[in-house]
């Protein structure tokens, strides 16, 4: 499941007019893209405007995800150095690791115990994220009936 914003959809039309130079698959933390290695040099070798990419990516992902959540990104670059990117839905295992990061670090023996109420609330959050990732459903009642 991929997500592309209206701004990126408009850029997609322009990028697809020319031949595609490269398609990059990246793993970037939401809202934390910067010029530091390995991302900065990776983008620099293709000659795109890195600052524009970082600003676009950080502003779009801050609204949708918690800061630092690992996101799979597909970056398309054409021969004129124009680009657009698509966000892929994070894996559910990554979402659960983000929610229970403190419990996993504090666990002894590899077993993690979570309260039932908290687990249900977090499953509800994940269900909402999955439903609204492509902005298909936003009604709480529909999500409540469908997932819980």
From Swiss-Prot:
Record flagged with keyword Cell division: no
Keyword Ribosomal protein carried by entry: yes
Recorded hits in Pfam families, A to Z, give: Ribosomal_L11_N
Instruction: Give the highest taxon in the source lineage.
Output: Eukaryota
What is any one of the record's Gene Ontology cellular component terms?
mitochondrial large ribosomal subunit
Query: A single GO BP annotation from the record?
Result: translation
This protein's UniProt keywords:
Mitochondrion, Ribonucleoprotein, Ribosomal protein
One MF term in GO for this entry? structural constituent of ribosome
Where's it found, cell-wise?
Mitochondrion
Major localization listed first in the record, in broad terms: mitochondrion
List, alphabetically, the InterPro entries matched: Ribosomal_uL11 (IPR000911), Ribosomal_uL11_N (IPR020784), Ribosomal_uL11_N_sf (IPR036796)
**Family statement drawn from the similarity comment of this UniProt entry:** Belongs to the universal ribosomal protein uL11 family.
PANTHER family tied to this protein: 60S RIBOSOMAL PROTEIN L12, LARGE RIBOSOMAL SUBUNIT PROTEIN UL11M
Protein name per the record: Large ribosomal subunit protein uL11m
**What gene makes this protein?**
mrpl11
